[in-house]
Amino acid sequence: MQAAFSYGHWQGRRLDNRSAVDSCDLPVGFPLEEAAAFNQGNPLTSVIGPQGFLVFENAPHLTVILYAYYEDARSFSCGRCTPCRMGTVLIAEALKNAVEGRGSTVDWDEIAETARHMKVSSLCGIGLQSAEPILGAIENFRAELETTEPVAGLQGLKDAKQYVSTATAPCIEACPAHVNVPRYIDYIRDGRPEMAEGVLLKRYPLVGTCGRVCVRPCEAACARRFNEQPIAIRDLKRHAADELGVGSAELFDDAMLKHPAPGVDPNQRIAVIGAGPAGIVCAYHLLRLGRPVDVFEMEQEAGGMARWGIPSYRLPRAELAGETDIVKTLGGHYRYGEKLGRDFHLNDLLAQGYDAVFLGIGCARGQFLGPPDEDQNAQGYLRGLDFLLEVEHSQGTPEGPKPLEGDVVVIGCGNVAMDCCRTARRIVKPGCQVTVAYRRIEASAPADPEEIHAARAEGIRFEFLSAPKRILVENGRVVGIELVRMHQTEPDASGRRAVKPLPGSEFIIPCSYVIAAIGQKMDPTVFIPEDGIALTRWGTIETKENFTTSREGVFAGGDAATGPKTLILAMAQGEAAAKSIDQYLKTREPAFFPRTRLSQIIAKAKLVGACRPTRPLPIEARYTSKFLDPEARSANWEEVEGAMTIEEARQESQRCMRCMRLIAVTTRNPVVEHEPTAPNAATF
């Protein structure tokens, strides 16, 4: 079903379906089906953004829509340049006059000239990109602006919750947590790392952790890549955390923690199962609302796969511990050594009086390769996660990790495979070789290219287009692996190229260890039928968009719901699940996330797009990360990557183009949103 389009100005075109019944003016590039419902039974009445504006049937008056938009533009302007700082004010004031019935007294030609100056002279995207709607309205629908009758005002629209907006950018939309990247970069440029950290703490407490191991989807979307290279966003995030010199747990004081948010019943208890990124972030947001939380963790330390699956040369243990302690700082409790399915079941928790449960149990079970006649008990044949866990647990013993006495072959080329091969390199006997074999080409490898580069620098060999055929075992011990060369097929209709074995190309790599790092899955044995938890055909927990499961009061997120993904996605889902749990405990109604829905519209309508620079920019080299010498670092567990200096961070932050875009929609009915605000929380 499509919404009935009325009129608008979109991508430089005047569109008007009001004058004739059979008019066929339709916006090009905007999927009208997205306007049919913002949330259930609630169609859009307008869309406004850098491309212009679209008005659908039963919409507010155009002046009201524009006034709301430019009031937002004024508040989102960084204020660093006159065209945007003053232009948004002048446009908003003109539209206020129009809303109040004085549109005929406004010099709209002068307002158009102001908007044109904004469009070419502003320093950031708010000014550069927000001029188009008013220019289109003045050029094509001036009669609407010159109204002499007062119309429903801005506050009426916003108070009725029929207006949803966001100031966003490619990096923000690419980040699953929708972190305001340009804002924290601004603070770093201004020498205020504590404020930069504050921006990040609005989303998650694992700031230094994410600043070290995030897979950086924001950088892949950074508009600066069209000029030379993306901003070093992850390094800047780490800089903010490093400059403070303390973990996020030490940034909160008791005065901020003791008052529940409005509508919160402090007697309602929540159990979070799993102290990984999703569970910790879920607990963090619930605790900040004043809700009691207990976190059940089968290990003796918090962090989940960030603690046990990421080696300390990438993520120092003290850094992670200083951030996972936030749960205790905020009044929550860790219950270590308690595993779901072994020590308790869901019914036990509910019988103990917990009002809601969050399942953040991750995907901690590795997979074997599965070739014919595979001996999974062969000595030297390991699953990747088992190997990493064994090494991590042995780090705290006097003996340390057990040396690997022979060559090692790692199968797979994801980030877990990179952690496995680089960990093996640190404990293998001198003179032994570590090899990575992957069935596709290097460009198809899911691992971070930086990790592949670092592994190569440490002397690890790669065999691409090579797939395992059988593991060679003698007397119960691995002695080698047989691989077969693969070749790429011609691209299919979608452009994808498959790989197929090359007949007669088999070869053997003698080795004492084969580590299978080809993926992980959730351990289904933690559940019993009485738990009532439905699983997908992929073996993950079946959830809805609001993170509810098949059992009332039980929610799930992170890898347990998505399959093995990324730390940043797990944290984003932990935050969203906390909001959903909060809504459930207040009303027993399902939660709806307006910002998430707006992001879906932004993506499908390509409202942000590639954001190529509109003006020539000087070539400015990206910050170059500093690493320990490969030969020296491969013999120890010290953190490999160094930190930015204050001056390096300042210079890198100045490369940010702040390519923000303001996008808004109005709806026919109120949007029932759920965005709880923690009491006494600082605003950044």
Region annotations inferred by a language model:
Residues 1-159:
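Redox cofactor-anchoring modules in respiratory/redox and cofactor-processing assemblies
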Residues 71-93, 116-135, 164-183, 205-227, ...:
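Local cysteine-cluster metal-coordination motifs and their immediate loop/turn environment
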Residues 177-179, 189, 193-259, 328, ...:
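Glycine/serine-rich phosphate-binding loop and adjoining beta1-alpha1 elements at the start
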Residues 179-183, 188, 230-233, 272-340, ...:
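Beta1-alpha1 glycine-rich phosphate/pyrophosphate-binding loop at the start
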Residues 241-263, 325-342, 366-427, 535-550:
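Glycine-rich dinucleotide-binding loop and its adjacent helix/turn
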Residues 264, 268-273, 321-371, 470-482, ...:
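Feature captures the FAD/FMN-dependent oxidoreductase FAD-binding
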Residues 377-405, 471, 491-564, 611-613:
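FAD-site-proximal beta/loop scaffold in flavoenzymes
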Residues 560-591:
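A conserved FAD-binding loop/helix module that cradles the flavin
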